[in-house]
């Protein structure tokens, strides 16, 4: 593909049609279009409303626990013998991941729009837990669609959602993972447009979702930039994050996009290897197409049918990626690379033993890339990585693979 021309700013998108270059847009059923336009209108008003922003900031500080710390991984840095490694500790947020940043923002929007029912999709269950959490906090009923495969491998999060009062609906269609859960949630939304708000968890879906989710998650990069300047007096040389749909990644990347000295890398799920279909590396091994209301890189066959991807990590097990990532790839601003299941598993164990932090399997993919790159960099160079979630939810998966009975 010809390289997309570089814009004056990498931070000015999307355009009024919700496009990032040829990606994004709004490909939705006619019934949903009025709702999408209404949502966009409300979002435009909310982001320019000081009262909305003040409430968001207040809940960020007192409910989520922001700002999350910037942590220097001293032992990992010493072990690898190269660049200084810093983690943005999003796993310390309320509910254990970055997902809550977006959920708080969207539930405030749902309340503003007068919606009385929340629906959400979830893969790893982290977004489901965060959605159920904010629904409980604001007294709204919540239905979470979750692939049957994920229900099985993320039992602790399913229990959490139920404890929080949400109804968890297992989806058996397809491979019973995130894509299928999103399909069901969209069907529900079409049927219940009047009272229902669809709280999308990733930076994908029809416009304005990719922009909205990015803006709510950009608090990660904005804080990290400030914290890095305070800690080191300069910006990092490299920013790394794991990418499934891509909300944690775009959240840390976006504030750095117009800083030319900062190299940015997104890490996709390479699964069992790119030669077969058992991976979720949409950019590395996919092609552009339309899924879930937007045009983006997808895993699809020659007839445009969506393939069933695979990843050890339920949160990266999605056959697409947010449209802004597709555009950032084509412009060359961000490099996207795959990490295999076994590499992520090894990184999971390395971080746990060296730093006393049990990471989720999603950011373990990013840790694996850090482990590859840090030794090749100078000791005066700095890596910033988004540690997007904690690994409590993954101990059963990891225990099973390592042959440790739980």
Swiss-Prot record:
InterPro entries recorded: Trp_synth_b_CS, Trp_synth_beta, Trp_synth_beta/beta-like, TrpB-like_PALP, TrpB-like_PALP_sf
Location of N6-(pyridoxal phosphate)lysine modifications: 99
Function, as annotated: The beta subunit is responsible for the synthesis of L-tryptophan from indole and L-serine.
Family stated for the protein in its record: Belongs to the TrpB family.
Record keyword Hydrolase present: no
Catalytic activities: (1S,2R)-1-C-(indol-3-yl)glycerol 3-phosphate + L-serine = D-glyceraldehyde 3-phosphate + L-tryptophan + H2O
Biochemical pathway: Amino-acid biosynthesis; L-tryptophan biosynthesis; L-tryptophan from chorismate: step 5/5
Listed GO MF terms: tryptophan synthase activity
Keyword vocabulary terms for this entry: Amino-acid biosynthesis, Aromatic amino acid biosynthesis, Lyase, Pyridoxal phosphate, Tryptophan biosynthesis
EC number in record: 4.2.1.20
Broad EC category: lyase
Subunit-level organization: Tetramer of two alpha and two beta chains.
Protein name: Tryptophan synthase beta chain
Classification via HAMAP family: Trp_synth_beta
Domain of life: Bacteria
GO CC entries: cytoplasm
Cofactor: pyridoxal 5'-phosphate
